[in-house]
Amino acid sequence: MFNLKREHFRDDYLYRFYQYGDTHSKIPSNLYKVLARKLDMISASENINDLRSPPANHLELLEPKENKIYSIRVNKQYCLIFKYENNEVNNLYLDPHSYNL
């Protein structure tokens, strides 16, 4: 299990949301439940392949692949991005992807 701690998060507000349920202006209220669930999934995972299920996670290794940076979907707009190396999650953050339509 990864057992997420403060040092695994890039941003303090996301750690405080995960650990204490603190809200923040950077986290939309419609994300609270699903974001908490996704963070729990990451924390409970034994290895990176555990995050392939459910398929709605859309686990993806981002380019360049040698950087070992992954993303999982929170919803259509938001992803959790993190580095996975040596069976450890680091630099975990919430990314509000901006679409240029």
Curated annotation (Swiss-Prot):
What's the protein name?
Uncharacterized protein HI_1250
Recorded hits in InterPro entries, A to Z, give: HigB-1 (IPR007711), RelE/ParE_toxin_dom_sf (IPR035093)
Q: Which Pfam families match?
A: HigB-like_toxin
- The species this protein belongs to is Haemophilus influenzae (strain ATCC 51907 / DSM 11121 / KW20 / Rd)
